[in-house]
């Protein structure tokens, strides 16, 4: 570098060109860096540390209680969220998942069953007792009252309740071979009915 600077110093025009290139490159890196951070903030907004800690303090004990009382294989779903990957944040198997390595067939199925899905992101929004049971959702964390056949287990000071779904199925269950071929419609409730009927072989 000192040798290069010494050579450019002998040629003022070259020194000017190098300086301009350095300035342009620095500006380009700065503008692109700012754009990247703004787009990341748009996709997954930044939050204050106290918001993050408060969310963990409110929700992690609920998850820990569930896992301590039930060591089985099941999903936990929420009707609220902090991030696009709350199950990874809180350490449980859930419905919310954001990944660039998504499986297209899974995303297509959840969308046809009426579950909120947006390209790389699967959610638990829009589930019903039927889809919860089929997908092994045994527990629900809800900040609103649930009355669709779920048992209330616990309500916290911050009005989040834990509900249990007594009809939750296992992650893996057998079904007739014909159930692999289902003709879906544009009606998610009809699709849920067809999916369930095919699983039952009817």
Positions of PLM-derived features:
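Contiguous transmembrane helix-bundle modules in multi-pass membrane proteins
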Residues: 1-55
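Beta-sheet entry/capping signal
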Residues: 15-24, 73-76, 138-139, 160-162
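P-loop NTPase catalytic cores that bind/hydrolyze ATP
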Residues: 28, 58, 73-84, 133-142
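Flexible loop/turn segments at secondary-structure boundaries
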Residues: 31-34, 41, 82-88, 96, ...
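Luminal/periplasmic acceptor-recognition loop/helix of membrane-associated glycosyltransferases
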Residues: 54, 95-134
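Membrane-proximal extracellular/periplasmic loop immediately following the first transmembrane helix
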Residues: 56-64
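Short periplasmic/luminal acceptor-recognition loop of GT-C membrane glycosyltransferases, typified by
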Residues: 63-102, 163
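Flexible, solvent-exposed extracytoplasmic
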Residues: 67, 97, 130-202
């Amino acid at each position: 570098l000192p040798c290069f600077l010494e050579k450019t110093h002998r040629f003022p025009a070259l020194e000017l060109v190098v300086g301009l290139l350095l300035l342009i490159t620095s500006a380009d890196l700065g503008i692109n860096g700012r754009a990247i951070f703004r787009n990341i903030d748009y996709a997954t907004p930044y939050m204050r540390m106290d918001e993050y800690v408060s969310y963990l303090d409110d929700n992690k004990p609920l998850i820990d209680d569930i896992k301590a009382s039930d060591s089985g294989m099941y999903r936990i779903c929420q009707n609220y969220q902090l991030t696009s990957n709350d199950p990874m944040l809180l350490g449980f198997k859930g419905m919310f998942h954001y990944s660039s390595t998504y499986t297209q067939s899974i995303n297509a199925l959840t969308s046809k069953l009426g579950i909120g899905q947006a390209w790389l992101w699967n959610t638990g929004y829009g589930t019903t007792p039927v889809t919860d049971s089929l997908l092994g959702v045994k527990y629900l964390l809800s900040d609103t009252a649930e009355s669709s056949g779920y048992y209330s287990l616990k309500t916290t000071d911050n009005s989040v309740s834990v509900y249990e779904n007594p009809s939750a199925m296992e992650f893996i269950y057998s079904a007739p071979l014909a159930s692999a071929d289902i003709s879906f419609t544009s009606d998610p409730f009809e699709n849920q009915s067809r999916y369930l009927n095919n699983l039952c072989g009817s």
